[in-house]
Amino acid sequence: MQLKSLQNFFKNGLLGYYPNEEIDTFFYRICSMHLKLKRIDISIKSEMIIPNHTFEYFEMVIERLLNYEPIQ
């Protein structure tokens, strides 16, 4: 899966629960913590292939956010 697809998956998973701006903030924060990517890197490397374990991590984060657990 490409980074851009992961971003779309993440956003679609949280739409209706959080505002778009907050979803973007969550995504950038998680990418910073888990992938060591800055916001600009996400734009530049949008075609980057994401390993399955990273996708699974983002799925878990979505589930936790749907339960309104804070990101730490």
Spans of model-derived segments:
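Non-catalytic accessory regions of SAM-dependent methyltransferases
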Residues: M1-L35, R39-I42
